[in-house]
Amino acid sequence: MKTTIKQAKDHLNQDVTIGAWLTNKRSSGKIAFLQLRDGTGFMQGVVVKSEVDEEVFKLAKEITQESSLYVTGTITEDNRSDLGYEMQVKSIEVISEAHDYPITPKNHGTEFLMDHRHLWLRSKKQHAVMKIRNEVIRATYEFFNKDGFTKVDPPILTASAPEGTSELFHTKYFDQDAFLSQSGQLYLEAAAMAHGKVFSFGPTFRAEKSKTRRHLIEFWMIEGEMAFTNHAESLEIQEQYVTHVVKSVLENCKLELKMLERDTSKLEKVATPFPRISYDDAIEFLKAEGFDDIEWGEDFGAPHETAIANHYDLPVFITNYPTKIKPFYMQPNPENEETVLCADLIAPEGYGEIIGGSERVDDLELLEQRVKEHGLDEEAYSYYLDLRRYGSVPHCGFGLGLERTVAWISGVEHVRETAPFPRLLNRLYP
């Protein structure tokens, strides 16, 4: 019977065949231990010399790392294994023998591993991170579908930019200029006026020459836009969404979190409501903590965000940033028009901002004024202004960076490990 490593638990004390790759092995004169993987998991195969043909044991000792195999044997309980079972191997069929696999069991430098990213993905740690990424995506669709959101796919090639000031990747669109999308927000706002609540999931591109552990040039973003929604209601949706994702990973990725040696007690504390601190209060807090390099009207850097998040040891919303450091489309704060109704969600443990969101300007005259103040081409934003001409309503939106969120949940140091093939400042291969 052919099965997978993950499904093998359903076949205790039965003979099965599994297609797998050999990740590592060790052997003595009488027994060989094969570390097997098949994409669904990792399992040990035990080959006992006295219980198999001589040719099988010889093959078990000689087979090379990352060779592909069909392995047949009996699934037996093993309490020492994370899975709780292993295979007593009876026969081995080599599908394809690997020679001189470059990523050997010894330690390798990061640049070497990134050069061989197509192979590094096979390792236990990288496999675990990708499984957690997959669960975050699955839980995302589950949350938005249950909450009545409609999935909308905004274009990747655009003629204008929602942020206005961010660096963009430029390309030619026949005889016109075009840019790779840095956000689907403006299109989602239009879709929200048709469907009420919408979300998107797709790649975004930022031509930022940053080398920090938090930044990728190409990253995936989950964005939501909600009509007839105010800022406070939007924050509630955001914290419910993040909490749902964290709980889903804790429930469905126990083995992966254990593989990564993640301290899950920190994730288990994540629950609504998240703490909130205004930008003004955050400035005062940082001053009291000895940060003399930040003044009112300046954006926070990584050390500032980390200090604030560490104070709460939970995801925390920083609200109501100064108008002058935020994009043109954010609604003024009625209590202080030098600030806007926005929030950044800062992840704990130094992972930084994972969500940015705001209430959107819904008044046509004010939005036209903002477009001019930011030096934007009004014609390029005419469709966006139309949304305020024809039945404008209060509405909000937010965007969550997938890779940063996965980095935080999985506990990996750098976001490059959370994308299958990360695009970094000096890396476009493989």
Curated annotation (Swiss-Prot):
Its EC number is 6.1.1.22. It catalyses: tRNA(Asn) + L-asparagine + ATP = L-asparaginyl-tRNA(Asn) + AMP + diphosphate + H(+). GO terms for cellular component: cytoplasm. One of its GO terms (biological process) is asparaginyl-tRNA aminoacylation. Belongs to the class-II aminoacyl-tRNA synthetase family. PANTHER family: ASPARAGINE--TRNA LIGASE, MITOCHONDRIAL-RELATED, ASPARTYL/LYSYL-TRNA SYNTHETASE. This is Asparagine--tRNA ligase. The lineage of its organism: Bacteria, Bacillati, Bacillota, Bacilli, Bacillales.
